[in-house]
Regions:
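Serine residues within intrinsically disordered or low-complexity segments
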Residues: 8, 12, 21, 377-381
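Catalytic cores of DNA base-excision repair glycosylases
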Residues: 26, 30-217, 221-230
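Short, solvent-exposed loop/turn elements at beta->coil junctions and helix N-caps
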Residues: 44-47, 239-242, 312-318
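N-terminal strand-loop-strand
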Residues: 232-278, 307
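The catalytic Nudix box helix
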Residues: 279-313
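Phosphate/ribose-recognition catalytic cores of enzymes acting on nucleotide-derived substrates
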Residues: 315-337
Length: 384
């Protein structure tokens, strides 16, 4: 096959047909030999059928998570909730507990909601029907439709954006130009083999066209890559100017009663961490001592009076939009019956029983410090 020269067509929205054909074929040939094969939801069962439910769960997990991280979560999920009916019938707390550690917990709640809508219905096979389900955007819908049904729908996840930004040496941050990148992905899609092509495109971004140190010599698109021709593939995609993340200091109270139980509350079903359990606390006000923050927040949120007795742990946790510093204190419960004034419910739990509740990732170190402080092993706290 003749290698086509790099030209200005690769910088425009429209690819020449000969360029499109070359890119499609070269990528598929590369994928047959080097693509990722050990992805369980990509393989048919003994009856020769793909598990559409498993594909759906996987694609939602992969929205904000890399494959190697999501894979063990997917395997545990499929063992516990192997069908859409099982998911629809599950308790939300079980769903959140299975998701614990993956972050962006609204994905789990929306999967649960969508399963209740899908129960007893045939699987949707058009874009609009998938987009109508909770938690499904255009790229996820396209990936499900191409993977499960071999339907010709384009995708645009982070890997694909990076590949296309380098292929065209696009000089602006991709987030501001989604329509441009959707146009590129639509043009390149092999409509005869959409399942294979979309998977190959994701594999290319995940294995060769990586954020750092891309393996350009092995790339099937090297001869047509404008970023490679410019000698600067790592400069693409162009990044937004970094902004310093604001820091919030959170005072947290681990409140103990005379029975040695700790007080936890369940967050409202809103925001990234909705429905999860946590140790109560809140933001430090300007000029306020952190111990006073804990006392005030527990009075406002739970209607209880506590005495701060000793520090337990201090830890930092970063989200995409802010940094949090948790100053955690052991507290003695003095008076007041705990009330869920700013949460769904409150509960007294023995420290060894905390593993039965889904907590945000930042709370794992708090729990570990608590168990160590009172001589409980982490193994004894795990749910069988």
């Amino acid at each position: 096959m003749r290698i086509l020269p790099i030209n200005s067509l690769l910088r425009s929205v429209n690819f020449a047909p000969c360029v499109t054909s070359y890119l499609q074929l070269s990528l598929l040939i590369w994928s047959e030999q080097f693509g990722r094969k050990a992805i369980p939801w990509k393989h048919a069962n003994t009856s020769g059928l793909l598990d559409i439910y498993g594909i759906w769960i996987a694609e939602v997990m992969l929205q904000q998570t890399q494959l190697q991280v999501a894979l063990p979560y997917w395997q545990r999920w499929m063992q516990a909730l192997p069908t859409v009916d099982a998911l629809a019938a599950a308790d939300e707390q079980q769903v959140l507990l299975l998701w614990q550690g993956l972050g962006y917990y609204s994905r789990a709640r929306r999967l649960h909601q969508a399963a209740q809508q899908l129960q007893g219905q045939p699987w949707p096979q058009d874009l609009e029907a998938w987009l109508a389900l909770p938690g499904i955007g255009r790229s996820t819908a396209g990936s499900i439709l191409s993977s499960a049904f071999d339907r010709p729908f384009a995708i645009l996840d982070g890997n694909v954006k990076r590949v296309l930004a380098r292929l065209t040496a696009f000089e602006h941050p991709p987030a501001r130009h989604s329509a441009h990148f959707w146009s590129l992905s639509e043009q390149l899609l092999d409509r005869q083999r959409p399942r294979d092509f979309n998977q190959a495109l994701m594999d290319l971004g995940a294995t060769l066209c990586t954020p750092r140190q891309p393996d350009c010599p092995r790339c099937p698109w090297q001869s047509h890559c404008s970023a490679y021709a410019a000698g600067s593939p790592e400069q693409f995609p162009v990044k937004e100017s970094p902004k310093p993340l604001p820091l919030q200091v959170i005072g947290v109270g681990v409140v103990l009663n005379e029975a040695g139980e700790v007080l936890i509350d369940q967050r409202l079903n809103e925001g990234l961490l909705g429905g999860l359990w946590e140790f109560p606390g809140g933001k430090q006000e300007p000029g306020e001592a952190i111990e006073a923050t804990v006392v005030r927040e527990l009075q406002e949120e739970l209607a209880i009076e506590v005495e701060v007795t000793e520090p337990l742990i201090s830890l930092d946790h970063a989200y995409s939009h802010k940094r949090l510093r948790f100053e955690v204190f052991l507290c003695r419960w003095i008076s007041g019956e705990p009330q869920a004034l700013a949460s769904q419910q409150v509960r007294w739990v023995h420290p060894t029983g905390l593993a039965a509740f889904p907590f945000p990732a930042a709370n794992a170190r708090i729990i570990a410090a608590l168990l160590q402080r009172f001589g409980h092993s982490e193994e004894s706290s795990k749910v069988a």
